[in-house]
């Protein structure tokens, strides 16, 4: 596969990705239907153009040997998680979620008020995605 060329993911590979976490989004753990699943690249394709310089060469090599679309680089994702992760790798996505949640709890008047009235409870996120909890339990 040439660098920058996006090769469609086969139905068989999509099924393997879906089965990886038994029909759950690898990030939030929500149950998803096969037709709703989006296939996320752990190391984003966009890193070849927009990512950190040290990752760009790694992604170019992944295009050459086609490992960019290998099962080890693919995760089942719900639409919301795939959209929110965007072109981030796992660590940047994790940090983005943590900082957004912390910011919302500190800065949003509505959130603080809802917490004050017991409408919502703040439980600090352990920073682990669904797939990481699954790997720990297996």
Segments the model singles out, each with a brief description of its role:
Residues 1-12, 30-32, 57-58, 62-75, ...:
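Extended charged
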Residues 15:
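Active-site phosphate/pyrophosphate- and oxyanion-stabilizing loops and adjacent acidic/basic residues
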Residues 23-24, 38, 77:
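The −1 position to Zn-ligating cysteines in a subset of zinc-ribbon hairpins
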Residues 38-44:
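Histidine-centered catalytic micro-motifs used for acid/base chemistry in nuclease
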